[in-house]
Design a protein with these regions (language model features):
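Short, acidic/turn-prone active-site loops that include or flank metal/cofactor-
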Residues: 132-136
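Ser/Thr-centric signal marking residues that sit
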Residues: 129-130, 162
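Active-site anion-handling motifs in enzyme catalytic cores
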Residues: 156
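Short, thiol/selenol-centered motifs that function as redox-active sites or metal-ligating centers
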Residues: 110-111
Length: 208
């Protein structure tokens, strides 16, 4: 079975809840259901601090990343008032996004993480969504990047997954798993995916 790798990028002031679902869903899939999926975390610095001051030691810094080693990019959103866009809009990260997209790799974003995708240009003339509260302020910002904004919880356009609030986090992680494990379509895989989704849905107490 071919090994698959997902890169989870953490910008300053990322949301812990949106980060943790990628680790949990892909970790359970690997540990209990035999999916050959592995995760590397990445940031601009060795330690990235979340919105509410939880420090995370990442596996790699952005300068160490070789896009060819990965099958997907996962991006948790974060709070602008805590400095999320200072790093999320950094040209080095925007370049990384463009490299993943140019190679047709899956890119999964949660909530406000769609904004750096928009700024990078990979969503121009494509369908996407982002944080929908605050009277749709951030969705209007996304439109400024030439994005066809859809006011739906999750929007998939080709290789890119976007969502509109933290409540969708687990759904996005499962969508990433479905699209990244990646086109293993045998019956065993479908069964294990269904069991895992049902189990984690109950644990997370979310509606999927």
């Amino acid at each position: 079975m071919q090994k698959k790798k997902v890169l989870v990028f953490l910008a300053k002031a990322f949301e812990i809840m949106e980060f943790s679902v990628f680790i949990d869903v892909l970790g359970w899939a690997r540990n209990d259901y035999g999916h050959n999926l592995f995760v590397d975390t990445c940031g601009f610095t060795d330690i990235v601090v979340s919105t509410f001051n939880v420090p995370v030691i990442v596996d790699k810094t952005i300068g160490e990343i070789n896009v060819d080693e990965y099958d997907a990019l996962a991006i948790p959103g974060g709070f602008g008032e805590f400095g999320f866009y200072e790093e999320a809009y950094d040209e080095r990260f925007l370049k990384l996004i463009k490299e993943f997209n140019a190679k047709g790799k899956i890119i999964a974003s949660i909530c406000s993480a769609a904004l750096p995708l928009g700024k990078s240009g990979v969503l121009k003339n494509r369908k996407a969504t982002t944080y929908h509260l605050k009277n749709g302020y951030w969705q209007e910002k996304l439109k400024e990047f030439g994005v066809n904004v859809v006011n739906e919880p999750i929007v998939v356009d080709g290789n890119i997954i976007t969502s509109y609030c933290p409540e969708t986090a687990s759904n996005v992680a499962f969508e990433l798993l479905k699209n990244t494990d990646f086109r293993r379509r045998n019956g065993s895989n479908k069964k294990s995916y269904g069991i895992l989704r049902k189990m984690l849905t109950k644990l997370l107490e979310v509606k999927l």
